């Protein structure tokens, strides 16, 4: 992802999370949680989770360092689940700041 942009992240799931009680998408960099999205900021379909980040949120990531992403959910039957960790990089931009 590029810093200073407003990317939409779509995560495909093999479990229908449309009836989950809680869903969190956590973004971690350098050992610290930088960002966490939760309902209602996440659009949920039977097969996808969709979340859009703001310019401010993507600017909070350090350049060219790994960003770990993980989804956790609490299903309506009380079962807690977690995805594998996804890794991406925050790419640089030439003009810093929000536009």
Question: For each of these PLM feature ranges, what is it?
Answer:
Residues 1-99:
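Contiguous segments within soluble domain cores/interaction surfaces
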């Amino acid at each position: 992802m590029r810093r200073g942009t407003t990317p939409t992240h779509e995560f495909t799931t093999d479990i229908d999370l449309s009836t989950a009680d809680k869903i969190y998408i956590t973004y971690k960099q350098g050992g610290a949680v930088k960002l966490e999205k939760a309902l209602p900021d996440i659009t949920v379909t039977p097969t996808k989770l969709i979340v859009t980040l703001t310019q401010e949120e993507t600017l909070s990531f350090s350049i060219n360092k790994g960003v770990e992403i993980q989804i956790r959910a609490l299903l309506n039957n009380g079962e807690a689940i977690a995805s594998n960790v996804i890794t991406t990089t925050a790419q640089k931009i030439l003009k810093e700041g929000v536009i």
